[in-house]
């Protein structure tokens, strides 16, 4: 895998390289990573870059985004992750296939024990990874329902023998099972002054030195705040929506 496989994000060469290296190792042995940072710092953009790189080098990408309104729905997050490969559940032992279908309301009967569902999820990913490396990319893990967080953590701690990569982004200050699992971490800090100026030039064009200094000081290296502080960001609804969606 070449370092150039990932698109460039301003001021994020170190983080992109770390993700690229992780995916490179993941084609041979499982890897897991927690991406941690403040709102607007760029976690979602980094996951997007990881997704592009993973697909470019042959991974099957399974992605999900935690949604606060679904945090009380058991296994909603896990369903997001596994839905594209649920047909492969037919390759599992019947007890595991039934466990997953029951968890997702696709089969009658009581919901199985969480441990059984977690084992079934691992076996399903292993079956898929036997044909093609798998990258599980989850944004806003802190908003996943508790059951899905625990299963995701279970998966991440059992990837080593298989071509499975698990990367989850967590907002700073939101403890949970995934963050507490002791997995390797990538802490995303604010961008430096040079990158901050480049972001401003990209979003706002030419600014007066005093305006540039003010925005840079107020943003404190946060890319979303940096972009939001530019006049062009506020004047362009398309720019505003796009930036808020892609940079967290």
Task: Describe every region a protein language model picked out.
Residues 1-248:
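Key residue(s) within conserved catalytic/signature motifs
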């Amino acid at each position: 895998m070449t370092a150039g496989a990932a698109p460039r994000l301003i001021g994020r060469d170190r983080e992109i390289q770390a993700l690229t290296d992780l995916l490179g190792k993941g084609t041979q042995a499982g890897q897991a990573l927690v991406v941690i940072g403040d709102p607007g710092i760029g976690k979602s953009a980094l996951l997007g870059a990881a997704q592009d790189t993973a697909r470019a080098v042959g991974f099957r990408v399974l992605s999900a985004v935690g949604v606060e309104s679904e945090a009380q729905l058991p296994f909603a997050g896990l369903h997001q992750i596994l839905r594209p490969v649920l047909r492969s559940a037919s390759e599992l032992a019947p007890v595991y296939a039934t466990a997953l279908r029951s968890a997702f309301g696709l089969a009658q009967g009581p919901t199985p024990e969480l441990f059984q569902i977690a084992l079934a999820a691992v076996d399903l990913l292993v079956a898929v990874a036997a044909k093609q490396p798998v990258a599980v990319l989850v944004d806003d893990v802190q908003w996943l329902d508790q059951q899905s967080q625990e299963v995701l953590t279970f998966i991440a701690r059992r990837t080593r023998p298989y071509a499975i990569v698990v990367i989850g982004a967590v907002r700073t200050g939101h403890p949970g099972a995934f963050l507490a699992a002791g997995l390797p971490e990538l802490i995303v800090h604010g961008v430096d002054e040079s990158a901050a100026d480049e972001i401003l030039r990209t979003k706002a064009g030419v600014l007066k030195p005093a305006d540039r200094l003010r925005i840079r000081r107020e943003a404190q290296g946060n890319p979303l705040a940096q972009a939001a502080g530019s006049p062009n960001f506020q004047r362009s609804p398309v720019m505003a929506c796009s930036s808020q969606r892609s940079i967290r």
